[in-house]
Structures are given as C-alpha cells and as structure tokens.
UniProtKB/Swiss-Prot annotation:
Pfam families registered for this protein in UniProt: UPF0114
Record's protein name: UPF0114 protein YqhA
Record membrane topology: Multi-pass membrane protein
Cross-referenced InterPro entries: UPF0114, UPF0114_bac
Species lineage: Bacteria, Pseudomonadati, Pseudomonadota, Gammaproteobacteria, Enterobacterales
Subcellular location(s) per record: Cell membrane
Signal peptide: none
Organism for this UniProt entry: Escherichia fergusonii (strain ATCC 35469 / DSM 13698 / CCUG 18766 / IAM 14443 / JCM 21226 / LMG 7866 / NBRC 102419 / NCTC 12128 / CDC 0568-73)
TM ranges: 15-35, 53-73, 136-156
Protein encoded by which gene: yqhA
C-alpha cells in the first residue's frame, strides 16, 4: 500500500505539465497583446506627445519582463517539479536550464516582480496628476512591500546557504 501511494504521488507531478504548457499559451497571448500595442501606436507616432510615447514604451517593457518571467517559471518549474527537458545537443540551449533550483527560481521571480512593479510605478508617476494621492501612496507601499519581500527572501537564502 505504501509503495502504491508513493508511486501515485510521484506520478502526480505530471499533473503540472499541462499547467506549464498553459503558461506557454499565456506567453502567446502576451505576445499578441504586445504587437497589438505596437500596431496601435505606429499610426499615431508622429502626433503623440513624448510622455504618451514613454508610457506606451513602459507598457512594452513591462510586457517583456512578464514574458521573461513566464519563460523562467515555465522552464525552471517544469525541470524542478516534473521532468528534465531533453533538448538535443545541436539546438541552442539556455545556459541557465538545469541550473536553477526552486530557491534561485523564487529569488529570480521576486526580482522580476520588483522590476515589473518598478515599471508600473514609473508609469503611475508619469501620470501622477490624474492619480489621487491616496492611490499613489498605496502604489508606493505595495512596491516597497515587494522590494522588502525580495530582499528578505534573498537574505534568508544567503543565511541558509551560509549555514550549510
């Protein structure tokens, strides 16, 4: 009975495979939205105010960071929790594949969230005249919470690695 339960639990990791594949579909949706934004801005590029263009560019950078985060979580999560990726030797392989454990993935995700939050906060500040002060305060508090969380996670990781 114990062996059956252990084998069933171990095999259940494959339930995550469609979830990671779903992230690739989310990446496709993000790419479509990215190019929709570019197609939307190109006809108006010469009549746009510089600040409006910068806001669009910040949105594109934001989407790019989210896309990178999706790729990192998709590949690293699959390799850490489901199965090793079998990439043929003659194909280009990302140099971090197979080297990122769950802790380093968590730290990279936290750093990505801080970067995404920074871009979002910059967009908010560029339009600060249209954002109520209490909302600005909450954006800053939430961003600082992300920064503090990432710092604490990195610090705790460093402590545990140093003690082992």
């Amino acid at each position: 009975m114990e062996r059956f339960l252990e084998n069933a639990m171990y095999a259940s990791r494959w339930l995550l495979a469609p979830v990671y594949f779903g992230l690739s579909l989310a990446l496709v949706a993000l790419v479509l939205k990215f190019f929709q934004e570019i197609i939307h801005v190109l006809p108006n590029i010469f009549s746009m105010a510089e600040s409006d263009l910068i806001l669009v560019l910040l949105s594109l950078v934001d989407m790019t960071l989210v896309g990178g985060l999706l790729v990192m979580v998709m590949f690293s999560g699959y390799e850490n929790f489901v199965s090793q990726l079998d990439i043929s030797e003659n194909k280009e392989k990302l140099n971090w594949l197979g080297k990122m454990d769950a802790t380093s993935l968590k730290n990279k995700v936290a750093a990505s969230i801080v970067a995404i939050s920074s871009i979002h906060l910059l967009r908010v500040f560029m339009d600060a005249k249209n954002v109520p002060d209490n909302k600005l305060m909450w954006y800053v508090i939430i961003h600082l919470t992300f920064v503090l969380s990432a710092f604490v996670m990195g610090y705790l990781d460093r402590l545990t690695r140093h003690n082992h």
